[in-house]
Amino acid sequence: MSFTIAIIGRPNVGKSTLFNRLVGQKLALVDDEPGVTRDRREGQARLGDLDFTVIDTAGLDEGPRGSLTARMQEQTEAAIAAADALMFVFDARAGLTPTDRSFADFARRADKPVVLVANKSEGRHGDAGALESYALGLGDPVGVSAEHDEGMSDLYDALRSVMPEPAEEVDEEEIVEPDMSRPIRVAIVGRPNAGKSTVINYLLSEERLLTSPEAGTTRDSISVELNWKGRDFRIFDTAGLRRRSRIEAKLEKLSVADTLRAVRFAEAVVLMMDAQNRFEEQDLRIADLIEREGRALVIAVNKWDLMKGGSARIASLRNDVDHWLPQIRGAPVVAISGLTGEGIDRLMIAIQTAYAVWNRRVATALLNRWFQQAVAASPPPAVSGRRLKLNYATQTKARPPSFVVFCSRADAVPESYLRYLVNSLRETFDLAGTPIRITLREKANPFAHKRKRKS
C-alpha cells in the first residue's frame, strides 16, 4: 500500500501549488484568494526516487458547526486520519500567525510524523519566518518555493526521513553514500572577470555564454545542462560579486541578488579565482557566504596557463583557505585553465567528490563510537565546578551533514569545544571541505519539576 502524506495548513500558504509540483500536473486550482481548495484531492507524487500518495486539503480554518467552513475542516481531518505523515505548510514571508500556532497543536495531536515546510522562501524575506517556526516544536523547517521549484532537494531529505526505508538493509558499519544518478546542481561564483563563463564554454565545447575582458559581462544567472563522462550536471553561470561599496547600478544589484539565489539553491558551489590575483577579502566573504548557506565548496584557480611556479602558489592558497576559513577546512583547491582545458577533469572530479561528502550520512553506531572516543580524549571543561555531561550524538540530516549532541547544559558548552567536535568529525569521517552543523540539545530532566516544587 502506498505511503500517504497529507498537506495541511491555513488557507493561502501555497498547499495546492506544492501539491501540483509534487504530482507534476496542475490538478489543483491555485489562486491568491484564500479558500480556493475545498475538497481533499489525492494524487500520485514522485520526488527523486520517492513514490507516494499526496493529499491536498482545504486550509485549516474553524467555522460554525454545519457551515461550509466546518465541513471543509472535516474533510481535512479525514485526510489527516488517512495519512501516514503530514506536511505542515506555512508562509515563510508572512511568518507565523495565531492560526498557524493553533493548528500546529492540531498536527501534534495527530501523533504522526510531521514535516514542517516553510513555503515562499525564495529571497531573503523568508528567513525570519523560517527561524520563527522553531517555536512550533515541529522540528527543522524545510525552506521551499513551490511556485519556483526551489528547495525540493531539501524536501526530499525531509520526506525520506519519515518514509519507510527500502527493503535493502544498510550495513551499520558503513558510511551511507548518496545516489549519484541525479544531476548535480552547481553554481559557479566569484569576483568579476575570473573566467567563469569561459570555463563553462569549454565544458560545453561551444560559445554558449558571452565572454569579454570587460568585467560584468554576465548579468543573469544562466543555467546550462551538460553530461560529463556519463554524469549529468546543471551548471549556473553567475554575475561577478564585487564589494558592496562598489555596487552602484540597480541592474548590478539585481544581478548580485540573482547570484545569491543561485548559491542558495545549488548543491555544490565552485568559487572561481583568477590565478593572477591575490586571495582577497572579497574571496573570503564569498566563501563564507557559501559556508553559511551550507553548500559543498570547491575552489578553482583559473587562468593557470598564465602562471609560473604554480605548485608553490597552490600550496599557499590551500594554507590560506585552512587558516582563514577553518569552518570548511580541507576544501579542494584545483588549478585550471578555461582557455586550454588544463585541470578541467580534476575540477569535475572534485565537484563530484565534494557533492558526495556533502550528502554523507554516518551510521548511528559508528557515530557514537567516535563520539565516546572524542569526549574521552578531551572532556568538555567544567563550568563553575560542575562537570558537563555529553550523552550521545545523532545525525539529523545530510546536505550538509548536521548532527545533534544531547547534553546536560547546552548553554554552558563553549564554542571552542564545538569546534573541537567539528574538527574531529571532519577528520574521522573524511568530511573535508563541507560545512558541518552541530546543534546542542538538553536532555529533559524528569526530576526538575519536583525540585522546583520544593523551593
From Swiss-Prot:
Entry keywords, A to Z: GTP-binding, Nucleotide-binding, Repeat, Ribosome biogenesis
One record GO biological process: ribosome biogenesis
Top-level taxonomy: Bacteria, Pseudomonadati, Pseudomonadota, Alphaproteobacteria, Hyphomicrobiales
Family of this protein: Belongs to the TRAFAC class TrmE-Era-EngA-EngB-Septin-like GTPase superfamily. EngA (Der) GTPase family.
Name recorded for this polypeptide: GTPase Der
All copies of domain EngA-type G, residue ranges: 3-167, 184-359
CDD domains: EngA1 (cd01894), EngA2 (cd01895)
Transmembrane segments: none
Gene3D superfamilies: 3.30.300.20, P-loop containing nucleotide triphosphate hydrolases
Residue span(s) of domain KH-like: 360-444
Binding site for GTP 1: 9-16, 56-60, 119-122
Keyword presence, GTP-binding: yes
Subunit-level organization: Associates with the 50S ribosomal subunit.
Positions of GTP 2 binding: 190-197, 237-241, 302-305
GO molecular function: GTP binding
Function as written in the Swiss-Prot or TrEMBL entry: GTPase that plays an essential role in the late steps of ribosome biogenesis.
